[in-house]
Every structure is written in structure tokens, then in C-alpha cells.
Amino acid sequence: MKLLRSLALLAVATAGLSIHALQAEPLKIGYSDWPGYTILEVAKQKGWFKDAGLDVELVWFDYLPSLDAFSAGKIDAVCVVGTDALVNGANGAKSKIIALLDYSDGSDMIVGMPGINSIKDLKGKKVGIELTLVEHLLLLKALEANGMKQADVELVNTPTNETPQTLASGKVAAIGAWYPNSGQALKNVPGSKPLFTSADAKGLIFDVLAVNPTSYAQHKEEWTKIVGIYYKAVDYLYDPKTHDDAVKIMAAKVGADPADYAKNVPGTHFLTLKEAKAAFTKGDDLMSVYGSMTIGNQFNLDNSVYKESQKPASYLTPAIVNSL
């Protein structure tokens, strides 16, 4: 009896340790230098996750490595372009898109060298972009708007964080990049200019919070709080009384000058909770994430990013946003 009682107590103690260990494991969110992701740093610095009783670890990455980490199961969630969430899913890492963070409103750019004054001037010339990512999609939109097609330019596959140096080298006539890389490219090459930006195609590029389905199912209460805190950070940025503090925090995270960063903030349309609810409404146009991601899915298919069409509606999970 004494042995049985000891074994029973050991089992209870072990179970208790397991539960504690499970609770002690933080929810890991991958984020990178896009402003719509970097704003999470505001929530971290202000202690809002801890105030809500949450154990959240924000893990800083370059953009593509953050997608790889999510695919490998090293993080619970990732801040990502909606189109790229489909790529991860097609490769086996399905996700639940539980929050819409922003849409690009000018910070994604096709930047031309001095003497290149329009998209039409790029005919027959080299353009440095990271193939199959959002700048590739933006370039195709720019070409289409100017009566051109991809075959009219020569694409040079260039990691986005290397585009400022590539433009400065003079080896290409233009590059495609998002902020802060787009801003750095303009600064590195006097006389360079934006030829086409995401402000010319609002809603083409939605950024989202994509969560591992198992983590979502097991921690829905925590994810609900996290989503609420994200929109609290957006409100903090938009509030004139706290705007400068938010910008200072975000700029410091990416090593940018706060004044320069502030000038570029409008290029990202951070979604308020109300706007996120509206964008989660089903529709065919770009201002509905359903319509936007349908276009992104077709882009991925056309460029052989994956072979089997993905269904955006199977990823989009508006329940948390609609409950707030």
C-alpha cells in the first residue's frame, strides 16, 4: 500500500510539473522589420502582454527566416503577407489567419535609378526584386497598369534586404523593396525615385497574423488577448498624444532615425479593429482580404510557387476579431 501511495503521489507530482511546464512555455510570435509587424514592439515595451497575464515571446527575424521558423514549428505564429501564408500552407504549414494587421499604402515601392522616370522606361532593362515575393506581385501590377508584361523587363533575383546596395551598384535600373529597405534605397542613390508604389494598388498587399492551428485551438483565450493588444498598439500609434513615443520605439527596433521613420509611417495603413472587421468581410475587391488573397493565390500559381490552388477562406479566421 505504501508503494502504491508513493507511486500515486509521484504521478500527481509529475502531472503537476507537466501542466506547469506547459503553462510556462511562452507563445512565440515571429516578427520582422515591416512597420505593421514592428509595432508589436510597442506592446512589448509597454508591458501590455504581462499586464494581461500572457507569456509571449516576440522573436525577431529577417522576413524569410521567420516563414521558415513557422514552417519548422519553432514559433507559434508569424507576422506575414497573406499571400505568403498561402505559400507556407501549400508546403505543409497550414495556418489560421486570426488578425489583419495592415495593408501597404506606399511603403512597398518600385524605385528607379536617376534617369528612369516611369515604369515604361524600364522596358528592356534589369529590375532587382526577390522573386515570388510581394514586390514581384507589385511589379506585375505596375507593368499591367502601364500596358506592359513581365517579359518586357529582365528580373534579377535580389534579397530584399540587399536591394539598396544593388540599386547603388548601378547593376539594375530599378529595384522593388518594402520599407525600411525602400527608404534606404532612395537615400543611397540621390536622384532615384519611386516609379510605382503600393499606394497605387491599395489592398494588394495585406499583412496578417498567421497562427499554427493547434496553438490556436489550445490557446484561443490567449490569442484573443494578443489580438486585442495588437489593436491597442495601433490605437497608441494613432493617438496624437502617444504617436511620437510609438514611432520612437519602432524606429529604435529597426535602427532607423525616428524623424525619418515618422515620415514613412503613412506608407503602412495600420488597421484599426473596426477596419479589420470591415476587411474581413467577404468580397471580390482588393479592400476585402478574401479578394486580395484570391489574387495572391493566382499569382503564386502563375509563377509556379505551388501547383495546387489554395483556398483563402480556409485560412481566414475572423472569429476573434469579430468577437472584440
Predicted regions and their residues:
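Short, glycine-/small- and polar/acidic-enriched structural segments
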Residues: E25-T166, A173-Y179, L195, G203
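Predominant activation on well-ordered alpha-helical scaffold segments within soluble catalytic domains
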Residues: E41, L86, L140, G183-L186, ...
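Secondary-structure end/capping motifs
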Residues: A217-V305
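Pocket-lining segment of extracytoplasmic ligand-binding domains
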Residues: G82-D84, V156, E162-P258
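Sec/Tat signal peptide C-region and signal peptidase I cleavage site
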Residues: L17-A24
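Hinge/cleft segment of the Venus flytrap/periplasmic-binding protein
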Residues: G296-Q298, D302-L324
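Hydrophobic helical h-region of N-terminal Sec-dependent signal peptides
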Residues: A8-L17
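Bacterial N-terminal signal peptides that target proteins for export
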Residues: M1-A8
